[in-house]
Amino acid sequence: MDIRYPASLTQEADDGFLVQFLDFEEAFTEGDTLEEALFNAAEVLTLTLNARIDEGIPIPEPSVVPDLHSIAPSAKVQAALLVRRARADRPFADLARALDTSWPAAKRLEDPHHSPTLKQLERAAAALGKRLVLSFE
């Protein structure tokens, strides 16, 4: 599973860049340079996803648009969304039992304000029939 969302970058008349996310109309930002615009895009995506999780607003799967930039949110948000998507409609109680932990501890795995350990993520992935895979970009 991949948690990168497509964003269009448009060069503005004043030599800055405007960034707009295809899947979130409320998520847009800008930057004076391409590097700054991409950094700001990751920040605004992280904030948007955090807000949607906190408010219980549905989060769409990333659209597949080859010609747009793919932007990833923070690792904490990615981890929370990956666990959420892998768990799907299974109750937290089932995940908690598989992890031999409490229901609140299992629920925290889907909270981007908490920092699960790699061991917790590996165990959650295994309990959900998945494998944890990491990469640097």
Label each PLM-derived region with a short phrase.
Residues 53-61:
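Short, charge-rich, low-complexity interaction segments located
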Residues 89-108:
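Short alpha-helical DNA-recognition segment
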Residues 100, 111-112, 129:
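Central "turn" residue of the DNA-binding helix-turn-helix
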Residues 108, 112, 123:
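Alpha-helical DNA-recognition elements
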Residues 33, 91-92, 117-120:
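Residues that mark the N-terminal boundary/hinge immediately upstream of a DNA-recognition element
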Residues 1-49, 53-54:
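DNA-contacting interfaces and partner/effector-binding or oligomerization modules
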